[in-house]
Amino acid sequence: MKVSATAFAVLLMAAALCAPASASPYASDTTPCCFAYISRPLPRTHVQEYFYTSSKCSMAAVVFITRKNRQVCANPEKKWVREYINALELS
């Protein structure tokens, strides 16, 4: 019994560490915050809209919302992120 509980705890920790860079709620507030950025550009055709995270968040981020309604965190200082934002503003 102890072995299965330990194995479950290890799997739970591994799942938490392997989570993609996505937005998640900050404490009890519904403002999404990011704790990691996506490492490579998203396909531009997958992005529908975006928003900036709140100043309450520990790190600034742009959250892109994909066609499949996924929220993906990106570094607002990256060139591709700024280009996507400009393209979305013009469309």
Swiss-Prot record:
Keywords of this protein's UniProt record, alphabetized? Chemotaxis, Cytokine, Disulfide bond, Inflammatory response, Secreted, Signal
Per the UniProt entry, what is one GO biological process? positive regulation of macrophage chemotaxis
Q: Name one GO molecular function term.
A: CCR5 chemokine receptor binding
InterPro entries, sorted: Chemokine_b/g/d, Chemokine_CC_CS, Chemokine_IL8-like_dom, Interleukin_8-like_sf
One Pfam assignment: IL8
Task: Specify whether Nucleotide-binding is a keyword of the entry.
Answer: no
Gene3D superfamilies attached here? 2.40.50.40
**Record-annotated disulphide pairs:** C33-C57, C34-C73
Question: Which cellular components does GO assign to this protein?
Answer: cytoplasm; extracellular space
Q: Where is this chain's protein located in or outside the cell?
A: Secreted
According to the record, the signal peptide region is 1-23
Q: What does this protein do?
A: Chemoattractant for blood monocytes, memory T-helper cells and eosinophils. Causes the release of histamine from basophils and activates eosinophils. May activate several chemokine receptors including CCR1, CCR3, CCR4 and CCR5. May also be an agonist of the G protein-coupled receptor GPR75. Together with GPR75, may play a role in neuron survival through activation of a downstream signaling pathway involving the PI3, Akt and MAP kinases. By activating GPR75 may also play a role in insulin secretion by islet cells.
State the family named in the UniProt similarity comment for this chain.
Answer: Belongs to the intercrine beta (chemokine CC) family.
Please name the PANTHER family in this protein's record: C-C MOTIF CHEMOKINE 5, SMALL INDUCIBLE CYTOKINE A
What protein name is recorded for this chain?
A: C-C motif chemokine 5
Gene this chain is encoded by: CCL5
